[in-house]
Amino acid sequence: MANDPRHLPSRKLLVTCALPYANGSIHLGHMLEHIQADIWVRYQRLRGNTVNFICADDAHGTPIMLKAQQMGITPEEMIAAVSEEHQKDFAGFDISFDNYHSTHSEENRELASHIYLELKKNGFISSRTISQLFDPEKEMFLPDRFVKGTCPKCKSEDQYGDNCDNCGETYSPTELINPKSAVSGATPVMKDSEHFFFDLPQFESMLKEWTRSGSLQSETANKMQEWFESGLQQWDISRDAPYFGFEIPGEKDKFFYVWLDAPIGYMGSFKNLCNKRDDLDFDEYWNKDSKTELYHFIGKDIVYFHSLFWPAMLEGSGFRKPNNVFVHGYVTVNGAKMSKSKGTFVKASTYLDHLDPECLRYYYAAKLNSRIDDLDLNLEDFTQRVNADVVNKIVNLASRNAGFIAKRFEGKLSDNFAEPELYNEFVAAADRIAELFEAREFGRAIREITALADKANQYVDEKAPWVVAKEEGKDQELQEICSVGINLFRVLMTYLKPVMPALAARTEAFLNQELTWEGIAQPLTGHEITKFKALFNRIDPKNIEAMIEASKEDAAAEMAAKEKAEAAKTETELSKDPIADEIEFDTFAQVDLRIARIISCEEVPKANKLLKFQLDIGGETRQVFSGIKSAYKPEELEGKLTVMVANLKPRKMKFGMSEGMILAAGPGGSDLWILEPHEGAQPGMRVM
């Protein structure tokens, strides 16, 4: 027991939630994890522990790159907008992050590179040529999640190329049955490419020991044992250009796979927090011999990455491992998978438009335990439970006593506390409730609290202050009865403070005192409270109906946008940009097209679209300005061959003379491609 961190005088904890992907909105499924973690974090703070609670957006990968292209903006612009939306949603639910960052940050780039280079130095990185699925229409290698097909194990259809949502199996996309490109719908072809691998099997003995440490949930430990029995495989940590992410140090057109730098995002976000504050030391929390505690809250769909790859990467690069990984199940609504058509796929922002976030915090807490069970948000039960527990049992306890204290005793509680034994029974429950909060058995903690609320209301019912108030000479008895009721309410709200922080804050204003775990040891006597105001409103079923309807409208709008995008895919380039009127051959022959080699390319200061080129056209050098800055970095173009209009009249521009035109194709923005001749063409050759 002496080594149990729960019994240390004061603890230092670093707590994380899984990083939401930066290409979509937060929904009520996400909120389960963030509410669960926030309750645990708030409980730890309430007990005097030091907690740093961090998160970030997972901002890399092909899905983000492609979606940004569809939107006609840069990936950086897209992830910035999504981050703002995510943080607003989490703030709306009172998720008390100390820092919210992005994996697309300098801190994360430096840490990812450092960890990779340490792993490489220590012999845990190797490379080999692999055959990989390639989209022949889009001319790009396909990431795992952009290949869909039939699971090779359970034969479920429409599964992603890295793992099966149905059976949880992980596999290579080349193992999928009947694979299709999720980008174009084309059947992928095999193409060779050099990839880099993390040697996970070297860490098997360490991972087995970590699994047997006794801290992991039994379901997680059992699942890991299955993976050990089936054999650990080397992990492909690289992806080919084009890709939105971090380039691998020392390699060209090779990028870190998003799942390598995503968990490092925990470190990056904490590093960012350390840079903002003078009282935090990054090494104290991440050194191999750290005495602090590290906990990850995640969903069951990403256990493989967090229980195998992540601790192995940390071990191999000289960092500490997590104390535990807390895994939760999925959210269902009304007993079924969340459905956009039924309006039960509810965005966090849509919920906040219609309902109090404290209601969902309470309901999730009432149904959460330490196991990996799915949680059903039954909307009828949700309404009944919140109204019955929070409004009728707990808040009503204050309202039915506060009026008498305000009207008859000028807001002052009795000097004498009439029911010390009853009060001590409520206070004695603190240890049991604390154990349940610590163990993430929130549902059991809520049952303990509501059972106490029943006892408190029973006391008030039996004493009937509304009757005593009518009897002469019983003012002291009335004051004492109501003071007991309000003090019992104070204890209950202290226990509920991690679950319902906004209600707790209103309670503190009403009681004119902060709610603290230690403070409830003694009741309030002779204490002045403020005039009672409504602390909490019951759920109106009409608001739930409005939320469902709004979710249906959101889904319909998304579907319309998706159909429009799909229609755009089938639209031909000719239909978008019809062929111009015919011209005579002699007219065309007047245009002198020449092969040119790009000698140098540089950005033009204060020009948003232009790149400045020096072109070799075979014995002559031309200066040309071209508006393709949005599609290319200057260093990518130097040394390439291209095609230019050589006899175009020179044009004087603000930034200099342009002596021709480089030919490029595409709709604009990042979708522009310069024309490149086949090998063998030489600068100065005429294009016929």
UniProtKB/Swiss-Prot annotation:
A motif ('KMSKS' region) lies at residues 337-341. CDD domains: Anticodon_Ia_Met, MetRS_core, tRNA_bind_EcMetRS_like. Binds 1 zinc ion per subunit. Gene3D superfamilies: HUPs, Isoleucyl-tRNA Synthetase, Domain 1, Methionyl-tRNA synthetase, Zn-domain, Nucleic acid-binding proteins. One of its GO terms (biological process) is methionyl-tRNA aminoacylation. ATP binds at residue 340. It is found in: Cytoplasm. A motif ('HIGH' region) lies at residues 20-30. Its EC number is 6.1.1.10. Its cofactor is Zn(2+). PANTHER family: METHIONINE--TRNA LIGASE, METHIONINE--TRNA LIGASE, CYTOPLASMIC. This is Methionine--tRNA ligase. It comes from Vibrio parahaemolyticus serotype O3:K6 (strain RIMD 2210633).
